[in-house]
Every structure is written in C-alpha cells, then in structure tokens.
A protein has these predicted regions:
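Alpha-helix N-cap/helix-start motif
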Residues: 23-24, 46, 117-119, 136
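Short, well-ordered turn and helix-capping elements at secondary-structure junctions
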Residues: 71, 111-113, 130
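Predominantly a Rossmann-like dinucleotide-binding segment in NAD(P)-dependent oxidoreductases
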Residues: 1-89, 143
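C-terminal glycine/acidic-rich active-site capping loop/insertion
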Residues: 59, 76-96, 100-103, 124-125, ...
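Glycine-rich phosphate/pyrophosphate-binding beta-alpha loops
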Residues: 51, 110-119
C-alpha cells in the first residue's frame, strides 16, 4: 500500500466474525464472560472485535472521516452467573457500518458473534486502480495480491505472497 502498487484506493472491506455467543442459554457476567457485561467491557463487538478492523484500516488506508453505523443486540436478556436472575443485555452483538476515508475511498465493516461456524474469521480486502490486496487471519502469513500489470496483460492476476518478519 505504501509503495503505491494498488494505485488510487477505491474500496476497503473488513469483517471479524465469531459464533461463541449465538447460544441463547449462555449466561452473562462472571470472570469467564466479562465481555458480555457493558460495565466491565465497555461495549460489545464494536469495541472488542471491530476495533481491530478499524485500527488496521486506519494504519493501511489513513483516517476515517465519515461513518454511518447500525448495531443490534439479538438476545435481549441473559441469566447472570452470580445472581441466577435474568438481566438486560447491554452490549452490541453485531455492528455493520459504512465509512469514508480521507483519501476518498469507501469502506464496509462488519462484526458479529452470531456467525455460526466462525470462531475468529477476520478478513480484509483493499481494491485500488492498479491492484487489490486480501488478507485472512486464518492464513496469517499470506497476502493475496492482484497486480493489474498495464505493461504486460499476460502477467495480470492474483498472487499469493508469503510474509514474515524478514
């Protein structure tokens, strides 16, 4: 991105999906479930998961200047582990938002703990005039890079790049 290989950036997409709170019988509160308590966690998926997507996006693509978001709490009440009584859930279970970066590119961000089958799916993709870049947490050391080679159309295409500390 810093080298300009993607050209002018048009789109940024990121998601962070999990399924560990989809069970409606899952209680809230206590040491193991502090993320479900707004008094302790501060927020739900927006602060816990989506914050990583936002931080990475700003690092790669610059500041965000506009946002329009929606959140949802799918299970409105859960039994508290300490009291055994039902209490209102005060965190967000899912968040989706559109954003605009200072460079003019548009973004879509999504995070949820209600994506059955996903334990920690975190992906991002950046699309530019000259190429695209995709990354998946499940394959941490690999970038997928599409090079739109203007000089030689025969070399256009996706490439898998192994990345490491070196």
């Amino acid at each position: 991105v810093d080298e300009g290989r993607l050209g002018k950036i048009y789109h940024y997409r990121a998601n962070f999906l999990q399924d560990w709170t989809i069970n409606t019988d899952l209680p809230q509160g206590g040491e193991g479930l502090w993320r479900l308590d707004a008094k302790v966690a501060g927020s739900g998926v927006t602060g816990d998961l989506l914050a990583h997507c936002i931080d990475t996006a700003i690092w790669l693509n610059g500041p965000i200047v506009e946002v329009s978001a929606m959140t949802e709490t799918f299970v409105k009440e859960r039994v508290h582990t300490k009291t055994g009584k039902k209490q209102k859930v005060t965190i967000d279970d899912a968040c989706a938002f559109l954003a605009k970066f200072a460079n003019g590119s548009l973004a879509i961000f999504e995070s949820t703990r209600y994506a059955r089958g996903h334990k920690a799916l975190y992906t991002l993709e950046i699309n530019g005039a000259d190429g695209s870049l995709a990354w998946d947490l499940h394959d941490l050391h690999r970038l997928e890079y599409y090079d739109y080679d203007k000089e030689d159309p025969k070399t256009r295409g996706w490439r898998s790049i192994h990345v490491s500390d070196n």
